[in-house]
Design a protein with these regions (language model features):
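Short active-site neighborhood of thiol/selenol oxidoreductases, capturing the structured segment around
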Residues: 8-10
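Short amphipathic alpha-helical interaction segments
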Residues: 336-345
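Cys/His-rich Zn2+-binding cysteine-cluster or related metal-binding knuckle/ribbon modules and their
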Residues: 54-55
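Local cysteine-cluster metal-coordination motifs and their immediate loop/turn environment
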Residues: 12-23
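C-terminal scaffold of the Radical SAM
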Residues: 2-4, 25-49, 58-337
Length: 345
């Protein structure tokens, strides 16, 4: 029986490293993009040649980063052509690209739509210029609105906007105003995340040395509740702890993660999971490129998930979603353990 699965591709290039971001990204390396694209194509071909993926039914592709919207459409089309040699592209329901307002030109947006990308995720983060500056974002609130309108004109009918709360000096009123302004745009999907202090980031350093004071847990919780309330009142369904969507506009790719479905991944730092094993690539562009030059996969390490690991992950992921834990799927994953009998006891 085939399993619905996703494909993730990581583009590490950025114009600036945001102080709160712990995803793998690099600046001042855009000259490496042509070589990077060729390496992604090589990784795809190598991976499919070395792995039996016949039981996986790929229906989503997610282009993340970094800043994928810095990549010219014809380069991304090369990647799609490589994938089409191994998968049935007619089965793909959703192709998402992450984009930063102010960095995705009208020409690029039109080009993305023409090559089959049907969903775009804008990293707004805030519509307050002061808070955007704190977050090291290069765009302004006005550029967010312009980028959204340009995407609509380019033909995107499925748009997500990422927002952040729990930002120092962000009041409940500012948060409410920002959310209502975003909702006026009527995106199909809104993600809203609490700003977390990740080790190794500039934000972590500034919080540790006292330069930045984070909001307390009570205010963080109030912001979360206000966000949920505003979204609900505006017709957005909260289907996961941080994600809100209009009817039938959930992010299909992210549902694969939360359902513990298989997904494969390409690019530096990318993580994949085939239903039994999880693996992750080297978190270095130079190492990634050099290993593929030797016709080897750039996998740093892997682990076999035990039944207990799968059980715990399905419970934790399920509790984040509105549908809760899928007992039938839990039974399938755990094999010998009959969850229904355990619950009755």
């Amino acid at each position: 029986m085939s399993k619905n699965s996703g494909i993730y591709i990581h583009f590490p290039f950025c114009n600036i490293k945001c102080g709160y971001c712990d995803f793998y990204s690099i600046v001042d390396r855009k000259d490496s993009i042509p070589n990077f694209i060729e390496s992604i194509v090589k990784e795809i071909n190598l991976f499919f040649r070395l792995n039996d993926l016949n039981k996986l039914n790929f229906d989503t592709i997610f282009l993340g980063g970094g800043t994928p919207s810095l990549i010219k459409p014809h380069y991304i089309e090369k990647i799609f052509k490589a994938l089409s040699n191994h998968i049935d592209f007619s089965m793909i329901k959703e192709i998402t690209i992450e984009a930063n307002p102010g960095e995705a030109s009208k020409e690029y947006l039109k080009g993305y739509r023409e090559i089959g990308i049907n969903r775009i995720s804008f990293g707004f983060q805030s519509l307050d210029d002061k808070l955007l500056k704190f977050l090291d974002r290069l765009h302004s609130a006005k550029q967010c609105i312009v980028a959204f309108e340009d995407a609509r004109k380019a033909g995107f009918e499925n748009i997500n906007t990422d927002m952040i709360f729990n930002i120092p000096e962000q009041s409940l009123d500012i948060l409410s105003e920002n959310l209502k302004s975003v909702i006026k745009l009527q995106p199909e999907h809104i993600s809203s995340y609490s700003l977390t202090v990740e080790k190794g980031t500039m934000l972590y350093k500034n919080v540790s040395n006292g330069k930045v004071v984070m909001p307390d847990e009570e205010l963080d919780y109030k912001m979360y509740k206000i966000t949920s309330s505003i979204m609900s009142d505006s017709g957005y369904y909260q289907y996961e702890a941080s994600n809100y969507a209009k009817k039938n506009k959930e992010c299909l790719h992210n549902l694969h993660y939360w359902n513990l479905d298989p997904y494969i991944a390409f690019g530096p730092s990318a993580h994949g999971y085939d239903g039994k094993k999880r693996w992750w690539n080297h978190r270095s562009l130079n190492l990634y490129l050099s290993i593929l030059k030797e016709n080897k996969l750039p996998i740093k390490n892997s682990e076999i998930l035990s039944t207990k690991n799968k059980f715990n992950e399905m419970i934790m992921n399920g509790l984040r979603t509105s549908k809760g834990v899928n007992i039938n799927k839990l039974n399938d994953v755990t094999n010998s353990i009959n969850i229904n009998q355990k619950i009755k006891k």
